[in-house]
Amino acid sequence: IEMVLDYLPQSYKCDMNAREQMHYAQCLAGQAFSNALLGIVHSMAHKTGAAFSTGHIPHGCANAIYLPYVIKYNAHEPEAMHRYADIARRVGLGGTSEKAQVNALIAKIEEFNRAMNIPKTLQEFGVKEDEFKEKIATISENAVGDACTGSNPRTIDPATMERLFTCIYYGTCLLYTSP
């Protein structure tokens, strides 16, 4: 995670040394998630990549869009909040409480997304609202059934997944506020 924070912005700007370091970071991340699995960010990205007629949502882009929302959702589970806060502390993000540290982590991810021109919402990505509404129940059901869902720190059912996707589509969510 520290390597990503250090090198991702420069890598995006075509710095070849930073890109090399990101390759190492990706390798380490791959080794980590081979043992720990991934959670619903990836479940959601798996099921939306090719789901909409407006075009393929690249897996990395989908992960980046979904991550801040999923952290907000997961952080309502105390152990998840503690672990996210620990990540924030380890990478030097501020905050006097775990809640503030988690919010700082979310803000940092959102800052990176803006710097790399990653849309904040599925609507901003270009997914048509009528198609989203037509497909969201099936996508949500499939995402809950994805193998990565079982390793998420907070359980989720299809109805809740649908509400989470709706939050991500519009970017306004009263249901999943910051922890």
Residue ranges and their predicted role:
Residues 1-36:
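Carboxylate- and glycine-rich phosphate/diphosphate-binding segment that chelates Mg2+/Mn2+
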Residues 22-30, 44, 67, 109, ...:
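Short alpha-helical scaffolding segments that buttress acidic/His motifs in well-ordered protein cores
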Residues 123-155:
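Internal helix-turn-beta structural module
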Residues 176-179:
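Conserved small/polar residues in nucleotide/adenosyl-binding loops
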